[in-house]
Amino acid sequence: MKNLILILLFTLTITNCDKTKETPLLLPTAAEPSAKLHNNQGIEYFNKGDYLEALIQFTQANVADVTTGEIYFNLGLMQHLRGNHEQAKILFKQAHQFANGNKKILESKLIEKHLDP
């Protein structure tokens, strides 16, 4: 139910999107298979502009694997796009925590924007 409410809020606020140059990240080769599947589907939907379905798929990827930084980055990106910067900040902190050396996460200008005081 909580996810449904988040999805509905996302839908209502998508028109207030802040454009960004960053795009969702692929998962590492060794990532949990169902997490990779949902993440890849999320990226496809993101690229088609279907941000609601992308959010759903990234959320499902996170359910399958809670230790992959790329998933948190992708969820943070979605929250950033909907203007929910406090939630994006929380997710980007988790992305950093689970980055495992991924420079796209560690050197992300978008993450820096949210994490800098």
Predicted features, each with a name:
Residues 40, 74, 107-109:
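Canonical tetratricopeptide repeat
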Residues 28, 34-36, 69-70, 103-104:
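Helix-start (N-cap) detector for alpha-helical repeat units in TPR-like alpha-solenoids
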Residues 17-30:
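Bacterial Sec signal peptide processing site at the extreme N-terminus
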Residues 60-63, 97:
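Conserved structural position within tetratricopeptide repeats
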